[in-house]
């Protein structure tokens, strides 16, 4: 979560550069949390566009026929019509492959099933790369079944029945403020933990300042690799699980440069995957995603190949890469929870999204006999 105040021409609007959208079907606990906190949300839009090879090939899904045929030449393109037909074939084949072994990668499955050319390079890989903020190369190593289950759960293996997406009114900092407001404990700001060491019946946290504080137990809600780096006395089981997760760095740039959007204005969507000589990147059109009208042309681009004009802010993030090792480690996570007064949670415990982080935290809370106000059954 990271909400930025963007000021343009004397007008300031909140813009999210991390967690942006959710929906009731796939984020039920996030929705329940927002409802409990009284956080207002509003409809969003999850249209998706591809601008390939410097704008030589463009289309947008979710904008109706005008978006699909934003490039009129596509009407007469056998390659384009073949891609559309292969998308339907992919959806059907993927729904039948939800139980594949984890060692079958997405790339190997695509090759085996004959998904090449336009459907692979101009739709499937850009879509998956945009969802997971990953390179198309790393997407090919994802376990196919895990990817298919995610797409199926989010209605992305069908043409109809997709959920209505929502965004937090006023930016996601609204719910963070509400959480802190209602929190009965103490929140320590600017107190980074350097190391965690367990001894006897106590757990010592050494802060970056050198101060040491002792507690009965610790819940580590950080990236898996950072958790392992802090946990100085990790045992073999903890090391086995936490060391299985790799992270890819991403630079998110908030800017106003339309050169990082599709070349044709009709193809502008909420999510835009753009490729050129320098590779591919994702640009989010924040005006459409967050219903921002007071300031136009607000974009967030991940890993732009060059510096955009009118940069308003930039941030460095890291996203987990869900290869076979990571997916396998998730299945072993339960075996190390609380074994030595340490519990682990975070979005890396699921698909890498906010709902996954919250569900993993709820599972940890239940180990302490605590349930969420809205919880009627254990989190899946």
Model-derived regions: residue spans:
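Mid-domain catalytic core of redox enzymes
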Residues: 191-320
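Helical element adjacent to the flavin cofactor pocket in flavoenzyme catalytic cores
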Residues: 149-208, 213
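Glycine-centered tight beta-turn/hairpin loop motif at sheet-sheet or coil-to-beta transitions
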Residues: 10, 54, 208-210
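Conserved flavin/dinucleotide-binding core of flavoenzymes
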Residues: 3-4, 60-66, 267, 279-380
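Mobile amphipathic helical/loop "lid" adjacent to a hydrophobic cofactor/ligand pocket
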Residues: 13, 23-144, 148-149
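Conserved N-terminal glycine-rich FAD pyrophosphate-binding loop of Rossmann-like flavoproteins
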Residues: 1-21
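General small-molecule cofactor/ligand-binding pocket signal
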Residues: 14, 42, 186-190, 343
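N-terminal Rossmann-like dinucleotide/flavin-binding domain of flavoprotein oxidoreductases
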Residues: 19-36, 175-186
